[in-house]
């Protein structure tokens, strides 16, 4: 959340310049995962300067705030973000709230027979092929790589109900993350105790604030229609829905 990742082993790059870089990453606490954040903060990441970049995200259901941070890191590196493709969990938010942890702890994507499988569906995985074919076509024809690459291809899908929840959740993660960093400086045991308390708080937050914000947004939707449309267009850039 605070973009202070643990260090990674120095990656070995085969070239000094690339025509295109695809950055695939997962979302941790509404932020880019620590490994990819560590790379983007390394000296090796300077190779992205003036280079077209495509981001590829696989996550449960929330990715907007993570991509905002990714955009800022790429901008700081003078990279050129030309596309973003996102695939999310095949089940709804409430089902995945159960199936995702079950998958993590058991290794079984469908731990509960009465719930959908966790993770991205096979159909969505197959759907990635048409983005690959489009990219191959552009490269083979020596066309210029720009933001039109994946436009009008359904590269991302913005869930209006989650936009407010993401902002609230990210604010919570930021505040608690700052508190946990301070607690760790006092005592690892103290930090662990506060962390356990936060886990309980987080579960309560998900079960209360997320549905409440969705209800509030639905009630206010007629009044916020234009604002929501602008936000959707912004978050969908550069590929669009």
What are these regions (language model features)?
Residues 3-7, 11-25, 29-241:
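FMN-binding flavodoxin-like domain, especially the glycine-rich phosphate-binding loop
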């Amino acid at each position: 959340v605070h973009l202070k990742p643990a260090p990674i082993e120095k990656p070995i790059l085969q070239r000094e310049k690339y025509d295109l870089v695809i950055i695939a990453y997962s979302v941790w606490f509404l932020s880019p995962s620590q490994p990819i954040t560590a790379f983007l903060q390394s000296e090796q990441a300077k190779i992205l300067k003036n280079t077209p970049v495509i981001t590829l995200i696989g996550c449960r259901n929330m990715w907007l705030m993570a991509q905002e941070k990714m955009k800022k890191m790429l901008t700081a590196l003078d990279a050129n973000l030309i596309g973003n493709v996102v695939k999310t969990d095949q089940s709804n938010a409430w089902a995945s709230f159960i199936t995702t942890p079950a998958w993590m702890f058991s290794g079984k994507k469908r731990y509960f027979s009465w719930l959908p499988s966790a993770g991205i569906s096979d159909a969505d995985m197959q759907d990635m092929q048409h983005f690959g074919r489009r990219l191959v076509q552009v490269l083979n024809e020596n066309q210029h790589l720009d933001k039109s690459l994946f436009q009008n291809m359904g590269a991302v899908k913005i869930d209006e109900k989650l936009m407010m929840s993401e902002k609230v959740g990210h604010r919570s993660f930021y505040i608690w993350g700052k508190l946990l960093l301070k607690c760790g400086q006092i005592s690892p045991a103290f930090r662990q105790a506060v962390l356990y308390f936060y886990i309980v708080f987080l579960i309560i937050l998900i079960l209360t604030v997320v549905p409440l914000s969705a209800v509030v947004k639905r009630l206010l939707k007629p009044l916020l229609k234009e604002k929501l449309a602008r936000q959707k267009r912004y978050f969908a850039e550069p590929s669009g829905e």
